[in-house]
Each structure stands twice: as C-alpha cells, then as structure tokens.
Curated annotation (Swiss-Prot):
It comes from the Bacteria. One of its GO terms (molecular function) is D-amino-acid dehydrogenase activity. One of its GO terms (cellular component) is cytoplasm. This is Uncharacterized oxidoreductase in pyp 5'region. Belongs to the DadA oxidoreductase family. Disulfide bonds: none annotated. Pfam families: DAO. It comes from Halorhodospira halophila (Ectothiorhodospira halophila).
Amino acid sequence: LQFTAALAQRLTAEGAELWLDTTARRLLGGPAGVEGVETSRGIIDADAVVVAAGSYSPALTRRFGLRLPIEPVKGYSVSIPLHGIEGAPGMSIIDDARKVVVTRLGEQLRIAGKAEITGFDLRLDERRWRAVREQGLSRFPRLAEQLADAPSQPWAGLRPMTCDGPPILGPTPISGLHLATGVGHLGWTFAAGSARLVADQLEERTCDLDPAPYSLQRYG
C-alpha cells in the first residue's frame, strides 16, 4: 500500500491523471488501429493504449481479432490478524513442497496458494482456503496454536497465465495497441520491470532488457 501510494503521488506530480474505480469497457478504433478506450467514466482518446488487464486482457483485444494465449488460474489467500502475537515470520517464506507462500504484512499474516482452472469463477471454496491456511501454518506449530481461534479473511483472485510461462510485453500487429499482461503469479514482482520495458518500446528507446522473449511475436 505504501509503495502504490508513493507511486500514485509521483505519477500525479509528473502530470499523470489517475482514473480510479473505473472500468475499461472496450477498445475503440477501426482498420487503422486502436484510437482510445471506452470506460465507465467516458471515452479516452489516445494514440497508444497499453492493455494491462490481467486475465481479462483477451476480452479487450478480441474485438480487433487479436487472440491472446492467456488463461485465468484461480488462487486463494487467507489473511489472519496477529494482534501482537510473537513468532510470526518477518520475511516472506515459500513452501515449495506445499505450494504456499507465507508473508507478514504489518500486523497480519497472509498465506497464499492453490491453482484452480475454473474459468472466471471467483467463488470462495471453503475447503480450499482452509487448506491453504492449514498448510501455511503447518511449518509454524507454535504460531498455529496461538492463531487457532483467530478469524480468517479469505480471498480469491485470477492469475493471467500464458501457455509458455513468460509475460507478453510490448507492441502488437494492431497499430497503437501494446500489451503488459500474462504475468501469472508474479504480477507484483514483474510490475516495475514490465512497465519500463513497455515504456521504452512505446518511446522507441533502447531497451536495457532484450524484449524478444516477452514479445507476442514469439507465438508466430
């Protein structure tokens, strides 16, 4: 939250206009390419548009005949308040055997994991999120005892997975349309680097990173 708040402050100071709580309904344009976006707050005219809509990116690009090899993969997280309890890990821990991640976020513990191919179904399966909680706490038996009666806040989200793993970053065959999507479960990890790579290509600057492995053209 602190990072995103600081980033928003920096962007607005540089002249960016942030439209929060706004839905991007469809891309606008025609044979010449993309010319803007229709949103729940009105139309934005643009010479270039970056689609960074995660699992919903294919729905936006389909109108221009561009089919993206991205599928939603559902994951769960469970947040548990600590209320001053000691013994919680001070850094993120990945349990590769159980496929869960345990992270302390201030005064709460967040456990995330699972991978379900269920389309865009975001319903919370209690069996699944309780399994995530149990698996995450199993490495910390004393902490598990202390949190046995603590409330849980479950959540489910969709990871935009490409068919080969890496994200899709950069221009498309459609004039004015660029992509920053398909980051899978590494959205936060890849965010800043993806933005830099896409921005460099938009501005036709030399990229510090070879863009070819992330280009849509790799699919032929």
